[in-house]
From Swiss-Prot:
Residues 240-253, 314-328 have a biased composition (Polar residues). The gene is PCGF2. Keywords: Disease variant, DNA-binding, Intellectual disability, Isopeptide bond, Metal-binding, Nucleus, Phosphoprotein, Repressor, Transcription, Transcription regulation, Ubl conjugation, Zinc, Zinc-finger. GO terms for cellular component: chromatin; nuclear body; nucleoplasm; nucleus; PcG protein complex; PRC1 complex; sex chromatin. Exists as both a monomer and homodimer. Component of a PRC1-like complex. Interacts with CBX8, RING1 and RNF2. Interacts with CBX7. Interacts with PHC2. PANTHER family: POLYCOMB GROUP RING FINGER PROTEIN 2, RING FINGER DOMAIN-CONTAINING, POLYCOMB GROUP COMPONENT. The keyword Lipoprotein does not apply. GO terms for molecular function: DNA binding; promoter-specific chromatin binding; zinc ion binding. Detected in all tissues examined with high expression found in placenta lung and kidney and low expression, in liver, pancreas and skeletal muscle. It comes from Homo sapiens (Human). This is Polycomb group RING finger protein 2. Residues 263-313 have a biased composition (Low complexity). Transmembrane segments: none annotated. One of its GO terms (biological process) is chromatin remodeling.
Length: 344
């Protein structure tokens, strides 16, 4: 599963702090020539006596340097959201200042300049703030289309919506909310509880503060969330193939080699007198003991053929037999005294 890496706010401080005062940006203002940002009061006071950027020495407007700076609302919103309590403390300082100096005129007369903007209106949240949310079962687009008919006819008031309302800290994660729903509804472990915002599934590591910042929720009502229950996906386990050990033949030996390994070697076979009659000694029931020799004598099977017969009896193949040696080819053999031509 993909996991995010959380970083500390101190690692982002070089991008969120003013180089002139050493504090976090307040009314962040950017120089258009080099895009370096500073606090508004800091850069205005600096450009009264200097015509260069404090960080890179890029020259700004020679005669009217204030024309080269712009207010950066996006950067200021990022600073307020990343630094806990910064917006709340800044609004309190402004209210205290104008309370101590009531005759001071506020430029442009904005509520934020007077410190009269609340955190709820700005959209900033703190970790310990309580967030109101609504949770209901996710029906899907098809079910919503099917229920449009009864709602248009006025029968939707009779149907219970099943919406539940909760008050949770802003630092609570989606994983904790899913565990709460699982325990509340006694969902078996083989099913997965998934939390959604509209039709988009939420990451388990998202906090309610992250959802409020990522999605267009303006805090004009409870945070609308949905949930659904799905079967948990099982991970596929691949069959492990045994690793061939050293000295083991894994190259796919041929059938001839496998048969020859199982069959006994011709050199180790005993004498074939038990299975074949000896050329010099007639066997019981042979033609020489009871009658004249056969008209068409048959030559005895050589040792290699005998071993082949034994191999065939054991389920082997005759095509894998070794060729008789040269000594067996030149040997003269007789059957019952009759010469037999040498084998070729």
């Amino acid at each position: 599963m993909h996991r995010t890496t959380r970083i500390k706010i101190t690692e982002l401080n070089p991008h969120l702090m003013c180089a002139l005062c050493g504090g976090y940006f307040i009314d962040a203002t950017t120089i258009v020539e080099c895009l370096h940002s500073f606090c508004k009061t800091c850069i205005v006071r600096y450009l009264e006596t200097n015509k260069y950027c404090p960080m890179c020495d890029v020259q700004v407007h020679k005669t009217r340097p204030l024309l080269s700076i712009r207010s950066d609302k996006t950067l200021q919103d990022i600073v307020y959201k990343l630094v806990p309590g910064l917006f709340k403390d800044e609004m309190k300082r402004r209210r205290d200042f104008y309370a101590a100096y009531p005759l001071t005129e506020v430029p442009n007369g904005s509520n934020e300049d007077r410190g009269e903007v609340l955190e709820q209106e700005k959209g900033a949240l703190s970790d310990d703030e309580i967030v109101s949310l609504s949770i209901e079962f996710y029906e899907g687009a098809r079910d919503r289309d099917e229920k449009k008919g009864p709602l248009e006819n006025g029968d939707g008031d009779k149907e219970k919506t099943g919406v539940r309302f909760l008050r949770c800290p802003a630092a609570m994660t989606v994983m904790h909310l899913a565990k709460f729903l699982r325990n509340k509804m006694d969902v078996p472990s083989k099913y997965k509880v998934e939390v959604l915002y509209e039709d988009e599934p939420l990451k388990e590591y998202y906090t309610l503060m992250d959802i409020a910042y990522i999605y267009p929720w303006r805090r004009n009502g409870p945070l609308p969330l949905k949930y659904r229950v799905q079967p948990a996906c099982k991970r596929l386990t691949l069959a492990t193939v045994p690793t061939p050990s050293e000295g083991t033949n894994t190259s796919g030996a041929s059938e001839c080699e496998s048969v020859s390994d199982k069959a006994p070697s011709p050199a180790t076979l005993p004498a074939t007198s038990s299975s074949l009659p000896s050329p010099a000694t007639p066997s019981h029931g042979s033609p020489s003991s009871h009658g004249p020799p056969a008209t068409h004598p048959t030559s005895p099977t050589p040792p290699s053929t005998a071993s082949g017969a034994t191999t065939a009896a054991n389920g082997g193949s005759l095509n894998c037999l070794q060729t008789p040696s040269s000594t067996s080819r030149g040997r003269k053999m007789t059957v019952n005294g009759a010469p037999v031509p040498p084998l070729t």
